[in-house]
Amino acid sequence: SVLWFAVGYSMVFGQSQKGFIGAMDHALLLDVPEAPRTENKTECDTSNSGVSMVIFEMTFAILAPAMVLITWTTCIKPTGAMLFMTLWPLFVYYPLTHWIRGHGWLSSTIKVIDFAGGLTLFTTTGTAHFLLTIWIKHKFPNCEKLSLVDQYLQEERESRNFILLILGSLLTMVGWFSLNVISFRSSKHGLILLNTHYTACGAGISWLLVVFTYTGQSSCMDIVYGVMAGLAGSSSCSGYVAPWSSMATGCLTGFLSSALHILARNQMSRCIRENCPDITFMFGIPAIFGSIAAGLFSNTPATENANEVKG
């Protein structure tokens, strides 16, 4: 939060410097209006959107480094975690977010579409988590065996309350509705809610079917994993596609993510977190495919206005 206040917001949404990084004109949140200056309901120009959008975008900036470290917290010293959560946003998250959501070179040159953080949040965290997993498992091969997280999951696996698990996933879906709706200031709120829901449902069903086909058995956890993957995929495209294509996107997202997850477990064990849901395959892969689906299935008006949506 302090880093975002000091330089983060300005690096992302400040005046673009040749498309690569924002200027420091909004450092310490200077010259940020208290209320939006634009009356255009279809445009969310973050440099003029007021402190409410500063807070909203800050949630992305806080979540990003935390998601990278979330499954390896017991294997990293507090000093190392603090160093990572300072340097990674400065050199990875802030520049990349400016390129896509801050009028940078990716949004202005090749018209990259990112609806609600599919590329800037979930793709970057999934990729970073993948690389971090490879490094930790190479450097500390016994880390998972000594991890308190893994010991706890092993002890609680049989006694887990699946009713609470399903309720928790439903609450997460409700929160995701707000995330996607706020990211697009227009009258398409109903369509966004519908697309988010259908993408999650399609991914949950397809993830479950893939696991059942491969292992001959399934559990409620497989549905939850699929729903989370679908929600991540919806963050890339739910404002640009029709309901039928959101369902298709969800089914394909769940299928690809689950299949790649199984393949990685069997063939690339050094690249995957064994006993925890892997961020790469639950959020990273779905977000990448969701971004591709946004380009494949989006209608013309949404694509034309895609670069005006910066919230």
Regions found by a protein language model. Give the residues of each.
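Hydrophobic alpha-helical transmembrane bundles of multi-pass membrane proteins
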Residues: 1-311
